[in-house]
A protein has these predicted regions:
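Short beta-rich binding modules
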Residues: 1-182
Length: 182
């Protein structure tokens, strides 16, 4: 009898730049004293039934009177909102508002309009966004590495894949992305 050796007709690679769908956005800033913004964006990759999280996290720089004066998290948050075509943001007091100045009490609820319904089991398909997925190196040697998504997310189309690759190359060259090699 002849040996059976199946041929691989396609490979599935869930690391690197991949199309994805946003299936949930949670505000976890209340869980951490140091985080003025902590948005956990849950992404479902095309062809996968498993989600990965991209986190937009950080604190504000503040003036002595308590007004927000800056912070790199603000730039990351507005870049993500631009990808969504979302006109929300923060005011000088660090409170969430829409473009008309209306207060947003629950930013996660507000952002839910930019997520897609998902049954928790079906593989992702027709992802509207591109994100970089990778296995993050553990912070301490010998600890577990986790599959994550980088917070830099682009629309899926045009030259966005090339732009995202340039951004990811920059983050890697500066040591902001540390991938597990083991």
């Amino acid at each position: 009898m002849a040996l059976f050796k199946p041929e691989t007709t396609s490979t599935s690679n869930f690391n690197g730049i991949c199309p994805c769908t946003i299936v949930d956005i949670q505000d976890k800033s209340a869980d951490f004293d140091w985080a003025d913004i902590y948005l956990q964006v849950t992404l479902l990759q095309d062809g996968s039934k498993y989600t990965r999280n991209a986190n937009i996290v950080g604190g504000f720089e503040k003036e002595p009177n308590g007004n927000v004066s800056g912070g790199s998290v603000i730039k990351r948050m507005y870049a993500f909102f631009a990808t969504l075509n979302c006109d929300a943001g923060i005011n000088i007091k660090g409170e969430w508002e829409d473009a008309q100045g209306n207060k947003i009490d629950d930013i996660a609820d507000f952002l839910s309009q930019y997520t897609e319904e998902w049954d928790g089991e079906s593989p992702g398909k027709d992802g509207k966004y591109l994100a970089y997925f990778y296995k993050a190196a553990p912070k301490k040697p010998g600890k577990q590495a986790y599959n994550v998504a980088h917070y830099k997310i682009y629309p899926n189309g045009g030259n966005c894949k090339e732009q995202l690759q340039k951004d990811i190359d920059w983050f890697k060259s500066r040591g902001y992305i540390k991938e597990d090699t083991g």
